[in-house]
Curated annotation (Swiss-Prot):
Mg(2+) 2 binds at residues 260, 262. Mn(2+) 2 binds at residues 260, 262. Mn(2+) 1 binds at residues 248, 260. ATP binds at residues 141, 178-179, 187, 211-213. This is Probable alpha-L-glutamate ligase 1. InterPro entries: ATP-grasp (IPR011761), ATP-grasp_RimK-type (IPR013651), ATP_grasp_subdomain_1 (IPR013815), RimK (IPR023533), Rimk_N (IPR041107), Rp_bS6_RimK/Lys_biosynth_LsyX (IPR004666). It comes from Shewanella oneidensis (strain ATCC 700550 / JCM 31522 / CIP 106686 / LMG 19005 / NCIMB 14063 / MR-1). The gene is rimK1. Mg(2+) 1 binds at residues 248, 260. It holds the Pfam family Rimk_N. Residues 104-287 form the ATP-grasp domain. PANTHER family: RIBOSOMAL PROTEIN BS6--L-GLUTAMATE LIGASE, RIBOSOMAL PROTEIN S6 MODIFICATION PROTEIN.
Amino acid sequence: MKIGILSQFPELYSTRRLVAACESRGHEAVVINTLNCYMNINSIKPSIHYQGQELTGFDAIIPRIHASVTFYGCAVVRQFEMMGVFAANDSISIARSRDKLRALQLLSRKGIGMPITGFANKPNDIPDLINMVGGAPLVIKLLEGTQGIGVVLAETKTAAESVIEAFLGLKANIMLQEYIKESNGSDIRCFVVGDKVVASMKRQGPEGDFRSNLHLGGCGEKVKITPKERKMAVAAVKAMGLVVAGVDILRSNRGPLILEVNSAPGIEGIEQTTGISVTEPIVEYIEKMVLAQKSNRPVIA
């Protein structure tokens, strides 16, 4: 097969590992910078061009769309879909998961546990919003933030009001979430492919920081997840319509809570922490789906 890897960063560990996984299974892997693609949108033969040439002959793509280019990246993925190319994560699912508020609403609809979350537009709604999520301490998040950036822990009601007013004054979209103190600055990252959790790790934030993101200096360690956590992770991915995703879970006194579903999860941290390849299952899943697509038969993922 000919598999395109949509990534702005060919030198990244994640990109290199995906290329290696494709090639080790006998496939041709082509890294395509998403932002350098341009599209011919028509009703007869939609196409994508890249560096002056039309992209043809692709059986599948693996989107690694950076959050900062979600709109254009989803347009490129959608164009590949219109050309009949299988996408490991389709454009609609990526867009769903990137809209943090919409993602939480979808999880809520499916009855999947998550931290109590509040969202408002007007400053005079702030006091009631704070009470709604259980009062201080509480977490304030920018909807557009990624990798722990734009996430603030407000220890008191006064601090929360000040931060919220400042964000709203900048016309920023924010949401409030209850603070799960018992998680102690840690979470569980589950790497899901299809209907399986192929690897999982516990992430612990640096001392004094409640955020567990590895990009912010957190560390990872192997962890054994419970059957309930495994089931919740897969259910959360399905709620988004994704195939490949990272699911972040908080362990709380009332059970596991889904924090986020990431459509382009980091690969380096979880592979180096667990010693498990997460890229091979991705390619294996693509093989199964493309074969089924070509033979026009249903697949049991």
